[in-house]
Amino acid sequence: VVNAKPERLLFLAFPLSILYSFLRFIPPFRKLLQMDKIIKAYSQCDIVIDEAGISFVDSRGFIMNTYAFVCAAVPMLCGVPVVKYSQALGTFKNGWNKFLAKWILPKIKLICARGKITQDNLAGIGVTENVKLCADGAFSMPDSEFYAEKVQKLCEDSPFFRKRVVALSISSVVQGKCEKMGRDYRGCMIQFINWLNEQDYNVLLIANAAREGSEKPRNNDLIICTEVYN
């Protein structure tokens, strides 16, 4: 495991990878640049698989899209091919995002487009030759009999699951969008859950993204789930 925090990747590894792309054929310089753990790790790989669930999306803004660019650029500058595992990309209406995407994505060895919309977004900026339409990786994984049995036993032993159950995925992303529209997302979810309870349903709250111990809402639905539950 190599420490590749965003600031370290952007301000240290990225400049070094540019130098490495020119100097890696000269043994003394290659050895010197490989003193950086990120450069050394990437340069020893046969292939790098980018497992971002979503990247190069207008709504993610300058910082996140720049980070997505650097994540792909550093290993490529180290001479290692990059494959983008099944993920969502686009839209590309923002100028900076479109510039970065058009520059780096055609150079990716293979882009697994997660769904037809992503494929169309990529085609809209002329990226087609290295794109393959794929399903979501998580939904393509085989079920584990071991965990399926554990879940089944949990459901059988818990009184909660002896009634009809509705699972509700509370989203911090949707909450943020509702706030911009002046809508009370938390209140709406509470009202909906109360109605389900009145119809004799138990409600199971699911945090799609969870960062235990974090008080920040990004990639963390635990906060809004807790607010709704309380």
Task: Go through each PLM region and give its residues.
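Active-site anion-handling motifs in enzyme catalytic cores
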Residues: 1-230
